[in-house]
Amino acid sequence: MQKTEEIEVDINLNADLGESFGAWRMGDDRALLAVIGSANVACGFHAGDPLVMTETVRLAGEAGVSLGAHPAFPDLQGFGRREMQLSPRELSTVVTYQVGALMGIAQSQGQRVTHVKPHGAMSNMACQDAAMAATIAVAVKAIDAQLILLAPALSELAAAGR
């Protein structure tokens, strides 16, 4: 009988969090934080607000979960799922604004944003549009070259992030 080798595998479960805003509660962030390794925090344009972002950062820190920004098109009513045609300057600024907001909140709590994962229509469009993907990747790198850009494999966004 052959002896099989044990292989240790690390799996990082990732989830979108902080999608409540105002009086509206969305999802069970506390339950998810118990099982995930990294969180994509809504940055206010598709969901979330400054208070929710602050609380989500606090809870993630307590759970030892790494933080990621989850920027979206300015589409609160459509939950960031409606396509928008933004100029490269507008797109870059929208991404920078949202990532910067989360970075400031995280820093105020002694934490660090480790990654960026575009949300909804922004992500879907950038996965197919090389110019849009490049705009997002350049914006993320300009903010902090150490940030990881999360993207689906074989997408234009993944290629731009390299």
Task: For each feature predicted by the language model, list its residue ranges.
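Hydrophobic faces of well-ordered beta-strands that scaffold small-molecule active sites
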Residues: 11-17, 39-41, 67-71, 114-118, ...
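Glycine-rich nucleotide/cofactor/substrate-binding loop typically near the N-terminus or early
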Residues: 17, 59-84
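A short alpha/beta connector and helix-capping loop motif
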Residues: 21-54
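Glycine-rich tight-turn/loop motif centered on a GG-T
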Residues: 29, 39-46, 77-92, 126-130, ...
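Acidic (Asp/Glu)-rich catalytic clusters
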Residues: 30-34, 55-68, 107-110
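Glycine/small-residue-rich loop that forms an oxyanion/phosphate-binding "nest" at active or ligand-binding sites
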Residues: 75-118
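N-terminal active-site wall of soluble small-molecule enzyme domains
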Residues: 75-77, 107, 112-114, 124-139
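Glycine-rich, Lys/Arg-enriched anion-binding loops that position phosphate/diphosphate groups
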Residues: 106, 129-162
